[in-house]
Design a protein with these regions (language model features):
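Short, amphipathic alpha-helical "recognition" segments used to contact nucleic acids or chromatin
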Residues: 6-30
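Conserved beta-sheet core of the metallophosphoesterase superfamily
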Residues: 228-320, 332-334
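Beta-strand-turn-beta hairpins that frame and shape the catalytic cleft
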Residues: 68-78, 216-223, 271-274
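Short, basic interhelical loop/turn and adjoining N-cap
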Residues: 33-53
C-alpha cells in the first residue's frame, strides 16, 4: 500500500485505515472501489483489497499490533505522586479514568495532600485543615468510583503529610494529643468525624484503600518511596535512591520514587542493573517554589505504569512514563510589550 499512500497526511492515512478495517470487519457498507474513489487513491479496487486482506497485509499487521498491545499481565500498576490536594492538576481524575479498564492497582507515592493549612510557609489566607480533609475524602471517593473493578489503592507517606505529626507534637495541651491521629492519611482508611457548630459530620472510610505509614514500601519486587533528598544534577537521584536501598539489603528489581517534581529513569548498571524511575508530579506549580531562588527549575508532569507477571522480575520494556504538558503557564502574565 506504500506507493499510492505516499504523500498522504497522517489524518488521511488514519481515515483510509479505519475505512479498510471497517470493511473487513463488516462495520460499514462501503465497497472497496468507494474507498479508492473517496480517497483519490488512483488504483483498482482489487489492488487495495488484496493489499489489505493478504496474509501479511494491512489487516494482518493491524491485528498483530492490536493483540501485541493487549498482552495480558497479572499486575498493571499506575504510579502517581505529589498531587498536593487541593492544588492538583485539573486532569488527574481524567488520567486515572483513562487507564481504569487496564490497571489492577493504583499506587500513590507520597504527598497526596499538601497540608498547606499546617505549613510553615507564609500565606495570607489558608483554606483550613478541615476543608483539606473533606476535599481529599471527596477526591478519593471519586477515584474509588472510577476504579470500579475492586482495584486496590495504596498510599505511602510523604513529607507534606508528616506535617500533621509535627503540628500535634507542638501542641501545648498534652492531654488532647492521644485523641488525635498523627497519620492523617489513615483517616481516609478508617473514617473520621468532624464536629462543627454543634453538628457531627461523619466520613466513612474508603473501601479498598491501604495506607502504609512509612516513606517507602516494597510491593512485590518494586520499591515505592518518597525520599526527602533533591539533586540539581539530572538523574543523580536515580543512583542515590538505588544505592540507599541496596545498602539496606532489600531484594528488588525496580524503584519508583516521588518528591522531586522532576523526571528521569534508567538502568543503574553500577548497582546490579536495577531500574529506577524518578516519577513526575501531578500538582499545579506553587507560588513559593518560583520565588526568585536561582536554583529553581520548572516541574515535570506525568505518571508511570508498570506491567508484570507474578513471580517474575519486572521487565524495563514494560515500564512506561507518560509525560504531560504544563497545565498552567503563568509566564505569559509576566510579559509586557511596549508601545
Amino acid at each position: 500500500m506504500i506507493d499510492y499512500l505516499r504523500g498522504k497526511s497522517k489524518e488521511e492515512f488514519d481515515k483510509i485505515l479505519k475505512e479498510c478495517i471497517g470493511k473487513v470487519e463488516g462495520k460499514n457498507d462501503k465497497d472497496w472501489q468507494d474507498i479508492v474513489d473517496e480517497n483519490n487513491l488512483g488504483i483498482h479496487r482489487d489492488v487495495l483489497r488484496k493489499a489489505f486482506q493478504a496474509p501479511m497485509g494491512g489487516y494482518a499487521t493491524y491485528n498483530f499490533l492490536k493483540n501485541k498491545d493487549q498482552e495480558e499481565f497479572d499486575k498493571i500498576i499506575m504510579f502517581i505522586n505529589d498531587i498536593h490536594l487541593p492544588f492538583e492538576r485539573d486532569d488527574v481524575l481524567d488520567l486515572i479514568k483513562k487507564h481504569s479498564e487496564e490497571i489492577t492497582h493504583l499506587v500513590i507515592c507520597g504527598d497526596l495532600m499538601d497540608c498547606e493549612s499546617i505549613s510553615s510557609y507564609p500565606s495570607i489566607e489558608r483554606i483550613g485543615l478541615t476543608n483539606e480533609l473533606i476535599y481529599t475524602h471527596n477526591f478519593l471517593k471519586k477515584v474509588r468510583e472510577i476504579l470500579d473493578k475492586n482495584q486496590e489503592i495504596i498510599m505511602i507517606k510523604g513529607n507534606h503529610c508528616a506535617r500533621m505529626y509535627k503540628t500535634i507534637s507542638k501542641m501545648s495541651d498534652k492531654e488532647l494529643k492521644p485523641f488525635l491521629n498523627p497519620e492523617i492519611l489513615e483517616m481516609f482508611v478508617d473514617g473520621f468525624t468532624i464536629y462543627k457548630n454543634g453538628e457531627k459530620q461523619t466520613y466513612e472510610g474508603i473501601d479498598g484503600l491501604t495506607y502504609i505509614p512509612h516513606w517507602y514500601a516494597l510491593i512485590d519486587d518494586i520499591i515505592v518511596c518518597h525520599p526527602l533528598d533533591f539533586s540539581r544534577v539530572k538523574g543523580k537521584m536515580l543512583e542515590n535512591v538505588t544505592s540507599y536501598f541496596i545498602n539496606q539489603g532489600l531484594e528488588f528489581s525496580t524503584i519508583v520514587f516521588g518528591h522531586t517534581h522532576k523526571a528521569s529513569q534508567g538502568v543503574i548498571d553500577r548497582f546490579e542493573n536495577k531500574f529506577a524511575v524518578e516519577n513526575p508530579c501531578l500538582c499545579k506549580p506553587q507560588e513559593y517554589a518560583d520565588c526568585g531562588k536561582l536554583g529553581y527549575t520548572p516541574q515535570t508532569y506525568g505518571y508511570t505504569i508498570i506491567k508484570y507477571n507474578n513471580n517474575e522480575r519486572v521487565n524495563p520494556n514494560n515500564i512506561k512514563t507518560y509525560y504531560l504538558d504544563e497545565s498552567v503557564d503563568k509566564k505569559e502574565n509576566y510579559k509586557i510589550k511596549l508601545k
